[in-house]
Amino acid sequence: VELAYDQLVSEGYIHSEPYRGYFACDVRELYDLTDIRSGEMKQKPFRTENNYGTAEAEGLHGKTGSNPKKQTSYEIDFSLNELSMDNFPYNGLSKIMKNLLLDHGKQIMSSGSAFGEKNLKETICDYLYHARNVRCTPEQIIIGAGNEYLQLMLIQMLGTSHGVAMESPTYLRAYRTFKNAGLSVREVALDDAGMRVDLLRKTDASIAYVMPSHQFPLGIVMPMKRRLELLNWAVEEPERYIIEDDYDSEFRYKGKPIPALQGIDRSGKVIYLGTFSKSIASSIRVSYMVLPEHLLERYQECCGFYACTVPNLMQQAICQFMQEGYFEKNLNRMRAIYKSKHDFMLAELKKYSWVREIMGENSGLHLLVEVDTDCSEQDVIEACTEQQIRVYGLSEYYISQNPKREYPILLLGYGGLTEEQIADGLQRIDGILAELKKYQPISVHKE
């Protein structure tokens, strides 16, 4: 029963009040199903009473994450991008690729569909429906080598006249992709429910880029009420769209995974982005995009002449990897491994008096830690770097407006570390902070 209540709270259907109990949030059916008549989409506004107001490393590791002039050898790197690959089914994937080349070599080596291979798209379609509640047909899925490529295809289709609203802090590679392509980017602040729709309305943006299931880097899960408010904003204008980046949504350690925003969209306003970079491996570089049906013809006209950037062999290998059960087994195994590391780091952090607050727990592959020190965030990072410990500061992920805060916040990833490395790294951070002489070194941990 308690788990059921926790799940409803996390999805925003109910809220708890101390010493009083649980109460239902005001979430109603806010819009009707879309009518498609004579090729035009009739949109009906939501009914609501209130409107509230590496390549991969560059995005995950902030503004200085991939500076070639600052190459440092680290003994322990609390990377936000590294995965645990010791238990990956290498033999299974190797067998699949070998058999594909032996049995279908000629077909594999030929050029495939520009939008991705049909059997892979059918497999992804089935997976997304059962795992993320994404509702689509295989024809709506576009395969590409990385989210950045798919974002560029979107820009080519939608045009550069659109303003893009982005959460701040955010995933910086997406920001740079939009900015360098010529779009005007409007940063929108977040509260504990995600992107503030009241501030979004004050911008001229017609596209909102959000991560509702696990916002990077803060780890916020957008509750249902805010999701509906965001959809309400989108249907008010015909050329408004929401780009839902569902990155990192597979790893949730308490309750069930939060369904995708696309699954509750009935007006064709959500463009869904997903990737295998966490669920399989970052080097796979295979992503997928789910377009609303009414955008397929426009995409064909604007981008249909591009060849698919994912080799046919890799597409067929991933398809069989999923169909033969390797993907699901590996994903379940990795959830257990990352949950163990998450719980271990959480327990270790709670031992230290310099840890004021821990945020972003129960999902993803990193934790946010507010540090009790008079030093600046940059001072802490540089002191750790001198001792060959790599940590990451939250300020690196803001687009421009970095709010002043009393205490620095560090992002500590655990995906690629062992428990021994986590414990050693935190103990060494403790010593580093003590050397900064802003607090007494710990000899006895907190009870």
Regions found by a protein language model. Give the residues of each.
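A generic "structured core" feature
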Residues: 168, 172-177, 241, 252, ...
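PLP-dependent aminotransferase class I/II
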Residues: 270-351, 357-361
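Conserved active-site segment immediately N-terminal to the catalytic lysine
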Residues: 257-276, 297-298, 410
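Conserved core of the PLP fold type I
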Residues: 97-239, 250, 256-264, 338, ...
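N-terminal basic, amphipathic alpha-helical segments
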Residues: 2-98, 304-311, 322, 332, ...
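Short, conserved active-site loop motifs that form the nucleotide-linked donor/cofactor pocket
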Residues: 141, 240, 270, 355-356, ...
